[in-house]
C-alpha cells in the first residue's frame, strides 16, 4: 500500500498517513466515485479535492491539524 504513495514521508509516519487517508476513504464511501478517492490523495493530499472532502466530512475545523500532518508526509 505504501510503495505507490506520492508522499515521501510515509515511512515512519504511518499513523499520520492513516489519519489523512481516512478522510479520503470516508469521502469515497459517501460519493462512491473513484475519481474522488484519487483526487483526494493527489499530490500527497495537497489537492483541492482533499479540502472539499474535509468540508463534505464536516471536518473543516481540523484543517490546521491536517495541514501540519500533510506537511510531515511531504517532508
From Swiss-Prot:
Q: Which UniProt keywords apply?
A: Amidation, Disulfide bond, Hormone, Neuropeptide, Secreted
Q: Which GO terms describe its cellular component?
A: extracellular region
Q: Could you tell me the Gene Ontology terms of the biological process aspect for this record?
A: circadian rhythm; neuropeptide signaling pathway
Q: Carries keyword Disulfide bond? A: yes
GO MF, any single term: neuropeptide hormone activity
Q: Can you tell me where the transmembrane regions are?
A: none
**Residue(s) carrying Alanine amide:** 75
Compartments (UniProt record): Secreted
Q: Give the family, as the similarity comment puts it.
A: Belongs to the arthropod CHH/MIH/GIH/VIH hormone family.
The job of this chain, per UniProt, is described as: Inhibits Y-organs where molting hormone (ecdysteroid) is secreted. A molting cycle is initiated when MIH secretion diminishes or stops.
Protein name, UniProt field: Molt-inhibiting hormone
Taxonomic lineage: Eukaryota, Metazoa, Ecdysozoa, Arthropoda, Crustacea
Amino acid at each position: 500500500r505504501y510503495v505507490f504513495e506520492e508522499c515521501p514521508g510515509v515511512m515512519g509516519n504511518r499513523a499520520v498517513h492513516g489519519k489523512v487517508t481516512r478522510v479520503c476513504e470516508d469521502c469515497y464511501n459517501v460519493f462512491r466515485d473513484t475519481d474522488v478517492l484519487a483526487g483526494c490523495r493527489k499530490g500527497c493530499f495537497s489537492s483541492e479535492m482533499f479540502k472539499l472532502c474535509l468540508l463534505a466530512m464536516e471536518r473543516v475545523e481540523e484543517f490546521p491539524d491536517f495541514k501540519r500532518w500533510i506537511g510531515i508526509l511531504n517532508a
